[in-house]
Amino acid sequence: MNKKSIRDVDLKGKRVFCRVDFNVPMKEGKITDETRIRAALPTIQYLIEQGAKVILASHLGRPKGQAVEELRLTPVAARLGELLGKDVKKADEAFGPVAQEMVAAMNEGDVLVLENVRFYAGEEKNDAELAKEFAALADIFVNDAFGAAHRAHASTAGIADYLPAVSGLLMEKELDVLGKALSNPERPFTAIIGGAKVKDKIGVIRHLLDKVDNLIIGGGLAYTFVKALGHEIGLSLCENDKIELAKEFMQLAKEKGVNFYMPVDVVITEEFSETATTQIVGIDSIPSTWEGVDIGPKTREIYADVIKNSKLVVWNGPMGVFEMTPFAEGTKAVGQALADAEDTYSVIGGGDSAAAVEKFGMADKMSHISTGGGASLEFMEGKELPGVVCLNDK
């Protein structure tokens, strides 16, 4: 990575405005999944050890520019204190006199959590005045929020106009792993692209067709490709306006010598529920009143075989509606194949794929699970991320 990180700067006694991604799911004021808080710990601990005054900023939910009581970061600050085993202070504002006073009272190694930055309308507009207010609290800006790196907001990008800007350890790791995967991959390199919609994955499929040896397609978006081959797909998800594009992608794969894998059999159902009756049919035999909801057993075997023989696999998007038990087997099988593949470096591209490997208890068997759904997708599309571009070069 050619951007400076916290390892490249002197932090002792410095006030550090560290943008983290503490956007954790909450239920009735309780955190239901603290993965993102834990992911930020190495950076926070490093800052503490180096004698910095650690000022943490994050968003939580979508308060739309106003204070929303249940989206305050108070429970997050409390949990962070428990995880760090030290007193963590919480400010009720993200800038201004109250925050400045609390920062002025900090000693080296102290940790302060600012209020939800999205309580202020200027945050998502990347307002220069708000960015200046944030910058006034600190000497150095650290961006460790890879999950928000694709956003040009005041606390992720704008603030870098007024302070020296470096990456945290999590951001550095994400950029290293994803960057290496795209610029210098070990081969065979396989991408698994799933999820519901072709339109969400157009950019990533197009970009990866130039990089990969194998492209595996699954999830709801597969049926647009199946229809492009001339098969009937019943009531399965289909984007009719993307059928020509699907044909174009299959043709491109052929021209570039990329092995393009699609389902050969699918799990179908007539109702969308936990107790649904399902059948397994070949891809050319979906009845008109049924819909495809998962990849079938033959497809799972083929995909597992490709995975096993790959050196690098990037996975973005589930193979079926994994949230419901009858439609979860395909996604589980892909996860299992990655967990079992000893010589394969597996990169899970955040979002639903990350949720799936967590759900099936396979997370610790994956080489790298990205903390950014949208950010990792845009990175894999070859786009520049505003929260990265703004950091100082080495």
Curated annotation (Swiss-Prot):
Sites where the protein binds ATP: 201, 292, 323, 350-353
One GO location term (cellular component): cytosol
Binding site for substrate: 21-23, 36, 59-62, 118, 151
Pathway given in the UniProt record: Carbohydrate degradation; glycolysis; pyruvate from D-glyceraldehyde 3-phosphate: step 2/5
Disulfide bonds: none
Gene3D superfamilies listed in its UniProt record: Phosphoglycerate kinase, N-terminal domain (3.40.50.1260)
PROSITE patterns per record: PGLYCERATE_KINASE
Similarity remark: Belongs to the phosphoglycerate kinase family.
Name of the molecule in the record: Phosphoglycerate kinase
Keywords, comma-separated and alphabetical: ATP-binding, Cytoplasm, Glycolysis, Kinase, Nucleotide-binding, Phosphoprotein, Transferase
